[in-house]
Amino acid sequence: LGSADELSANNQVEELQRRRIKGEAHFLRALYYFTLVNLYGQPYCPKNVATPAVPLKLTEFVEDKDYVVNTVEEVYARVLADLEEADAYLKGNEVKNHPYRADITAVYLLKSRVYLYMQNWEEAAKHAQLCLDLQSELVDLNTFGNSETAFATASSPELIFSMGGNNIPRMLNDQFAGLSASADLIECYTQNDLRRQFFLTEVEYTEYYDCNKYVKQEATNNANVSDNFMFRTAEAWLNLAEAYACMGGENNEQEARTALDRLRQHRIETSHYEATALSGDALIEEIRAERRRELCFEGHRWFDLRRYTVSEKAPFTGSIRNTYSKYDYFWDDWEWKYYWDVSSSSTYELTAGDPAWTLQIPYEVLQFEELAPNPRHERAPISTEN
């Protein structure tokens, strides 16, 4: 940003390029700080926004000074300020058909996400609709093709913006992957939900499912979109649905159902599709479940669970459990392949209000800046099996 301010434009084209660079930079800084505040700060609660989050550093040069931790409110204010700057610089200043360059559509979608986290339902709905007014297409899985084609790619008509791809999706999509889809996630999909086919794949000779959303099983190529920083039209439809559902009232709930069903019509087998008839908290919960099914493996779930715990509408008061297992691997000369057995498993529980919903600031940062650590307590498993 500082360098862009020092550039002089010789003509209108160069000035538009300079403004575009500034707009993209403001968008990216907003996205980075939005990510940081949701990792290391408490979830945004309108009644309690003075809690510590992360330091704000807005200069590009090294400064010899001590930084202080800014509050959740201050970081969110900075995120929105950067998005307003991005809006001003990118509106009407487009680079068409470039998935790795943020434009005004991406700005609107990120704004809708930020306002959704802030529980500002009206602004969330407004900016989701602004995004959809520019790009609303959804892939119809009923006619998508065969199971050999990956769903999330740089050429998808749903893609609004993505950072570059990496090899993580490929590394987590073979029989030796260190992670797999949870049984709870798999059970979220009905047999008529086509996402089960295009988002997940069963690992041969096991009871596990891997993600095949970005690359197919045993693929040798890396994903060409990010598994954490990807913006799709599907999210805009879900943001719109959730915002209207949380506003409440007959008309708003009908808008929510319409937005939700627009997505579901493209995901459920046509012969088994039924329109949504829910209302009230049941509608909100169904939209949240749909969000989990649709946005799995895109970096949304942890942040969503955090914000549900402080939501004024249908707050999440339960707990989540995860089981971590250790495996013994062995080679079978006769079958010429590896097999494995679970040697031990430990189950941990995270309840609503637990400080572990906020990650600990890395040790190196705490030492360098002499910052106060986020509160934690020693955690023991609730059960262990050997």
Regions found by a protein language model. Give the residues of each.
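Aromatic- and glycine-enriched pocket-lining scaffold segments that form the walls
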Residues: 90-125, 129-131
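TPR-repeat structural position
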Residues: 76, 121, 250-253
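Short coil/linker segments at helix-helix boundaries
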Residues: 14-16, 39-73, 77
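Conserved, well-structured interaction surfaces
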Residues: 1-40, 70, 87-92, 221-228, ...
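Hydrophobic-face positions in mid-chain alpha helices that act as interaction patches
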Residues: 101, 119, 123-234, 269-271, ...
